[in-house]
Each structure stands twice: as C-alpha cells, then as structure tokens.
C-alpha cells in the first residue's frame, strides 16, 4: 500500500526530493534591468537560454553566486538538450524576491520561481538538510552559503556538478547524442574546465557511464527512498551501470520504497518505460527487491514457467514484451509499454496445470487496482486496463466483416491500433515474428472498417436516446440503453440499417417484441444481451 499523495519530484535535478513546486510567477522586468552574464564568443553555439543568463547576470551584479546545477549540467556534458534549467545561489529567498519583482516563493525549500519572457525558471538557495524521519523529505531545511554543502545533499555524482553560468560553454545540441559518455564529454567542448564545479567526481563517472551515490549510499537512500527508484530509472534512461556499493545499498533498503506515495512511484515508472531499453531498469528493480516493494504482483512472475523461450520464465517474457513495444512520442505517456508490463500480471494468480485460464480478466482487475493505487490519471488507468482485458483475442481469417466490426466495437475503436501493437510486442516477447496468426491481415481489415466510417459505437447511430424516447414515449433508464445497444449490434452486422426511419421502426419492433408499451413504464428490462 502506498502512502497518501504528495508532490511529485522534479525529474533529474538530483536534489533531495520532493520539493514543493513553486507556483507560476508573474513576469519579472528582466528585459532591461538584469546585467546579462557573459555569453559565448561569436560563432559558437550557446546552449544556455538567454533567460538563464539574464537571471545569473542580475545575481552576479548584486554580488551573489549563480550556478546551473543538477541534471541540466549532466545533460550539457552529454551533448543533450536539458529539459529543465535549475539554478542555485547563495542569495536568500527574500533577496531573490527583492531582485526579481513578480517572482514567487510559495514553499519552504528555498525555491523561487522567476519568469523571463514566456519561461519560468527555478532558483534555489544553497541549503543543507536535517534528518529524514519519513524517508521522503527533510524534517528541516537550513539555508547555507557554500555550494559544496548544497551539492553534497544530492543523489548521484553525475547530478552533483555545478556550472558557473558566467563562463562560456559551447555544445552542439543539434547533433545526434553521443553513443557513450566519453565521446559526449569530448563534444561538449567546455571552454574552461574550471567552470565545472565537481567535488564528487561526477564528470569522471559520467565519462565512464557509472551511477554512483554521493557519499554513503545507505545514508542517501534512507534520506529519500525514491532515490533507489531513480537509480534503476537512470540505469535505463542513461544506459549507465550502477556502482556496486550503490547497488548493494539498494538491495539492503529496497523495502523502504513501500512507503513512497503512488504519484512518485508512477512518475519514475513512466519515465523508465520511455527509456530506449526499459528492461535494463526493470530487471534491476527485480534483482534488488524494489519491484517486490512497489509491485508485488509483477515480482511474482519470476520463476513462473512460460514455455515460450527456452530457459526463460514469465518475468523474462514480460521484459522482452516491454522492450518490443513501440517507444512513446515525446510528451506522450508510455501507454503501450505500461500495458506490455501489465499484460500478463494475472498469470501467477491463475496458473494451474500449465495453463493461465482467465488471466486476461484477472490481469485487468489487478491493473485497474494497482494504477488506481498509484493515483494514475483516469484515462491512463482506463486505457491500460482495456488493453490488458482484450489482449488475448484469437483472430481467424474466416472472420466476416461483421465479425471484424464486432471486434472493434468490443475493444473500442480508439484502442484497436494499440491493441494490435501490443499483440505484436507480445509475439516478439514470445520469441515469434510480430505477424503471427495473420495479425497484419487483421490490422488491414480493421483499418478498412474504420476508414469506411460505419457505426461502431452509439455516437455513430443515426438516432440517439432522445429520438427513441420521443418516438416510443418512454423515459430514460437502463432499458433505453439496452435498446440502443441492440440497435447498434444490428447496425454493426448490417451497416445499411443505419438510417433514422429504419432504426426508429426497429426500435418500435424490438420494444413490442419485449412486451413493452408506450408511456412511463417504457420497454421491459429484459431487452436481451449483446450477441457475441
């Protein structure tokens, strides 16, 4: 059971999480007032936004320090465009508010939101933290004057570097990301190596592709147990190896992850699933015990015989299937990979005599319960559950067009392509070709029916509930819904029936056959069930 909701962490800053998110700030008068920090020489590409340099210039002009910190420094050195730009300074929040009229400070962690143009940047005062009695957030935050103290509280060495913003940095962010960290560092072309403040050896670890906790890993993970999930996530997203002492500390304290809120677990899981090869992180989570802490139903897959790829169990199949599922587009949730992760979650509970009877229905129930526990968005819970529920369809080339339309109606027109992609990934995860049992033929036939714009749900009928209520003089209620469902089934079988007058005639006939009379009583409730 996860604990109550709490603010989700920033993705890659590396600081103690969670921080209370700063509110959107009103625009600060930065166009003329700030003294911009030093920029790149002519002809060099400057990856640092002008707004960041403007903020840094104002801070430096006022006698304060200004550094980029956390994940943005790591990504700059990798030759990757940072998603977020986080600054750290010795200026106190009240000093920041005085320097930047319109800035907002609505948390206790020293983070001030400063808006420059259309962008809002987070600027945080140097700090060191007190004890972490709940393994999630510091009991007290003390503002400091030393950058090293601020970096010492961060999670991993690659996230514990700082860049003096006034220095020149040239990075080609239009080029393809380097395959390995060493090449990325070469291409980053930091003009002055001294501009990178690196007290914990993060740059060397970045070059070697190593994920290492700052200081004692046991202390870091007991401060904030989310850092263990971040470790396996970074292993997948960055392709890094977790340093042995860091990995061992995760194995010792993996059970602490049970206390994490659902939102924090979900945020890390979704980011991991969007990685190039998610199984890297998933397998680490299983091996260290993290998976058992956050998703015991998935952890139970290990050791369950699968009988598909020799020598592999059900968990191996799940990992293969996740890797085979299409990677999501930027800013899109990894729906398909989440469904791939959960598609066989019902198998351990249904395993008997070498079979998994009804595992799709059981899996759908477990999926809905787990994603609800994680406080996933309703659409993501519903869409993932639907894919898990319907992933065991059995197509045959003898299906009529009406059978194809009925299949689309049952699964949902908007879900069909995802469902077929999930089946293709499931096939690959089983050591087979994606197009087993005529999957591409079914995809083509589904596309034909969708392109024909035939009615596949109630919104496609030529009449609606109001039309039926007026024509038959019946009230709204379950019987009306059943009647509309029966009309839709008839149209699915014969699209030519989708005509207003025909449907109203059919509605009267169906109501009469059920013994219904017009008036308040309406059609009887024994309107039948949808044909299979």
Kindly label every feature range from the protein language model:
Residues 1-532:
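Catalytic cores of the polymerase beta-like nucleotidyltransferase superfamily
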């Amino acid at each position: 059971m996860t604990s109550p909701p709490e603010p989700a962490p920033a993705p890659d800053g590396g600081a103690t999480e969670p921080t209370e998110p700063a509110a959107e700030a009103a625009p600060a008068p930065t166009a003329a007032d700030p003294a911009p920090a030093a920029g790149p020489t002519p002809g060099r590409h400057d990856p640092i936004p002008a707004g960041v340099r403007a903020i840094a210039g104002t801070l430096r002009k006022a006698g304060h320090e200004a550094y980029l910190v956390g994940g943005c420094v790591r990504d700059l050195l990798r030759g990757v465009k940072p998603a977020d730009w986080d600054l750290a300074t010795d200026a106190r929040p009240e000093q920041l508010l005085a320097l930047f009229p319109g800035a907002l400070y609505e948390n206790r962690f020293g983070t001030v939101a400063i808006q420059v143009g259309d962008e809002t940047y987070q600027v945080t005062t140097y700090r060191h933290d007190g004890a972490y009695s709940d393994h999630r957030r510091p009991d007290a935050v003390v503002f400091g004057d030393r950058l090293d103290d601020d970096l010492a509280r961060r999670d991993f060495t690659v996230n514990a570097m700082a860049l003096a913003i006034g220095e020149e940095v040239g990075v080609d962010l239009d080029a393809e990301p380097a395959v390995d960290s060493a090449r990325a560092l070469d291409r980053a072309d930091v003009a002055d190596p001294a501009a990178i403040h690196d007290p914990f050896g993060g740059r060397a670890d970045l070059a070697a592709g190593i994920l290492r906790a700052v200081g004692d890993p046991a202390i870091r993970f007991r401060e904030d147990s989310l850092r263990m999930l971040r470790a396996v996530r970074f292993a997948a997203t960055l392709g890094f190896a977790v340093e042995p002492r860091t990995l061992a500390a995760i194995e010792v304290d993996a059970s602490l992850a049970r206390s994490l809120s659902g939102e924090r677990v979900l945020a890390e899981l979704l980011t991991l699933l969007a990685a190039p090869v998610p199984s890297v992180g998933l397998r680490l989570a299983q091996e260290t015990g993290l998976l058992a802490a956050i998703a015991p139903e998935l952890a139970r897959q290990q050791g369950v015989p699968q009988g598909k790829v020799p020598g592999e169990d059900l968990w191996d199949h799940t990992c293969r299937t996740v890797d085979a599922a299409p990677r999501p587009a930027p800013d899109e949730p990894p729906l398909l990979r989440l469904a791939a992760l959960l598609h066989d979650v019902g198998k351990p509970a249904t395993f008997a005599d070498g079979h998994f009877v009804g595992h799709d229905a059981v899996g759908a129930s477990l999926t809905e319960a787990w994603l609800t526990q994680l406080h996933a968005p309703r659409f993501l819970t519903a869409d993932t559950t639907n894919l898990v529920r319907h992933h065991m369809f059995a197509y045959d080339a003898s299906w009529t067009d009406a059978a194809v339309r009925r299949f689309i109606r049952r699964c949902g027109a908007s879900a069909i392509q995802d469902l077929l992609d999930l089946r293709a990934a499931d096939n690959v995860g089983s050591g087979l070709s994606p197009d087993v049992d005529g999957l591409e033929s079914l995809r083509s036939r589904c596309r034909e029916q969708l392109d024909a714009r035939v009615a596949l749900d109630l919104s496609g009928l030529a009449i609606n509930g109001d039309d039926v209520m007026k024509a038959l003089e019946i009230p709204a209620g379950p019987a009306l819904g059943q009647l509309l469902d029966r009309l839709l089934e008839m149209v699915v079988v014969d699209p030519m029936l989708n005509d207003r007058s025909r449907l109203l005639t059919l509605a009267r006939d169906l109501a009469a056959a059920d013994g219904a009379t017009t008036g308040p009583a309406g059609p009887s409730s024994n309107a039948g069930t949808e044909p299979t």
